[in-house]
Amino acid sequence: MKKYELVADKIKAYITKNKLHHGDKLPTITELMKEYQVGKSTILQAITLLTQRGIVYKVQGSGVFVRPTGRDGYMSLTDNAGFAHVLKDPTTEVIEFAEKRPPKPLCDYLHSDEVCYFIKRLRRQEGKPFVLEESYYPKSIIPFMSKEIAEGSIFDYIKDGLKKEIRFSDKYMRVRKLRADEAKYLELEEGDPCLEVYDTFYLANGTPFDSSKLVYNYQNSKFYDQSSDDIISVSYTHLRA
């Protein structure tokens, strides 16, 4: 994990510990530098990361302020940090662990049809199934994987164990009806609605390392999204009445 990411996590923990609410102001850049014993550029990178995650916002000339927190039990559609930090009592069941080539369209997202680690998992929150997940990790990029690792946080293993930096993702979503095999795992009926998400995650150099299909239980999954604190400029010449 990069130094600015560690600092960002510490600032987020500070917000939680001190029960800061929407509109509360963070310490100044100078105060944060002194508190965490890092340079100005590291603090600015950490603030930028927190801004992108929808945790804080900047007001020019005034400082950095806390944004509203997400509701309990809601998962961010755009956060790449995984489920564990937002869900209550999450558990993971590894249904299948194998080595195989990905099918279309997953091999297209990976730009490769090489042999991958294939992991099929059922994720639960407070004992209730909320997502069925099928993931492919190219062996040329993720050289080692095990069922034991898959039972925990794969992303923590990639970041902390393999020292790889996870940067961004592409998501394609649609609503459809459940197949019989999916319904069995999600404890629903065949033909019930679901949200299907195709996820591709990339390393810092732009290499795709994870292509996944996630099928969400419509009864046990709730989502939210927050735009980042970017200045949006609108050209009124393009607006129509």
Where are these regions (language model features)?
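Basic, helix-initiating cap at the start of DNA-binding domains
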Residues: 1-9
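Residue-level marker of alpha-helix boundaries and capping positions
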Residues: 2, 37-38, 145
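N-terminal helix-turn-helix
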Residues: 10-66
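All-alpha effector-binding/dimerization core of bacterial HTH-type transcriptional repressors
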Residues: 68-235
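Conserved small/polar residues in nucleotide/adenosyl-binding loops
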Residues: 237-241
